[in-house]
């Protein structure tokens, strides 16, 4: 028998004995190895027995022997590959844990050599990178030799693979795993331009990761709650996983914290003016403002370093603060469907003074109802005009019930605005920030466009805000799936109301009304308590009420519809009380003044005064939409001798009725009777839901309302 045949016989005999007598099988193999020490099959069989018996130490020694003596055997590398895969695996099963323990028994030098050789045999870029990363973590001394090369390979692979998003497996491994190893190892020498390149890549990744829902998941409008027209959009319930990575690897804890740590390390390596200890975003921004003031006094190299310090520090404060603001006012953009439902908020001009700026000469027309009104404190007065505070220091009002952390959210909004202003205050910052935004394609970020729109409205640049809102609508259209007919997305409704508030601020009242009436089609009824007076705001009369000239309102029908009615009232009020006569506008004002009655009583008295001066009044929609008992009594009184016998044409087609009654019952008798009966019927309607009446008014009379403002 040949030597090869002898070896095969001994191995086969040992295999047969394993199930019956393990020790006998091992004795056969020990004898065989003594006789044929250069035979690989004998060594491998011994290793297999020890591995299957899960004897870590013995199996480790045998694996080491095979690695040293038979480095070219494919079976050895297959075995090593299985073990290194277990090292990268998150699984905690028994077999995986055994393989990890087996690897730990090997000498460190052998572990390092194994990992390097396995890496060389990997043809898949991602797998090769993970293996090399395993090496760098276990043997930090290898970072100097392999760290930068691995980082560049990952960035190159990202380019070659033409990844659509910065949030991909290659960038994740580079930013979260490789980059910290490189920049925290002071033996790795990195030029400043390479550090800035890496910081840029990290910032792009983390910001896109935090805000990924905006780009990666389509928004669509689901079934709406009857009490909430503009409820948060529903999204797919599947968890976010980066393609090529496991769910665990895809999850990043405290991404903002990680990003600012990278900023600090890069800053120290680039010799920025750093402060010891952690600084808040507010402190950091304040420091950057100070640095900008005396930056030009440094030499050219330091000057260049500090310019980059201001750029990247301010930029990160801006994106973080803007994100914190938007994620608070519209959390549905970033939260999964299982998160608690939160109503979005929308920034609007405050038109709470719509009932103000009224001076009434009560001596001209006194009635019992108006006498009662004399005792009531006016909600607004004309001197409030002096308190206007437009521009940089405008106030934003938000209810604690709508936003529990309102102080923090408004602070984030302030920091984001100030960061934005600083980034555009110097030519270098403007140029570099614009370049970065173009490279990152920030113009496609829906969440950022929402912030920018609110910022422009805050600044009072309403024409720019209108352009931004059209950009927002186009952007939303490109990201959304086709909508169900008759349903508007949250962003579409947000755009309508913000367009309305901007057109109003510009004095474009017909456009204001048009947007409001379009929005009315989306209102969900019934809205309860909409017609009750809001006593809370008028309990304490602020000295400068109009200084509070912006509001964050919930995107619900209950909150938005009253605001829309305020806008319409403000539009028609200006036309109704001019020197020229406009009964239609005056009639619309009277209908709209029913909301929040008696807050609008002073304005109603001014309307009555104007009717008295005219001696007559025509508004044929009166009995369709006026159900306020005080108003009905006032108009009934106007018909009496004491009220001035004012001629009122409030019934539909009343002119035709007068002609008809001339023949049959005389000119006035029949009309008076019709008016009395109509008034009695109207009194019986006083219990109707006022918001339903006003909603019907907006829907049914849309054409008439717009014609009045033409």
From Swiss-Prot:
PANTHER family noted in UniProt: INTEGRATOR COMPLEX SUBUNIT 10 (PTHR16055:SF2)
Protein name per the record: Integrator complex subunit 10
Predominant cellular place of this UniProt entry's protein: nucleus
Natural source organism: Mus musculus (Mouse)
Function statement: Component of the integrator complex, a multiprotein complex that terminates RNA polymerase II (Pol II) transcription in the promoter-proximal region of genes.
Family: Belongs to the Integrator subunit 10 family.
Phosphoserine: residues bearing it: 231, 381-382
Keywords, in A-Z order: Isopeptide bond, Nucleus, Phosphoprotein, Ubl conjugation
GO cellular component terms listed in the entry, alphabetical order: INTAC complex; integrator complex; nucleus
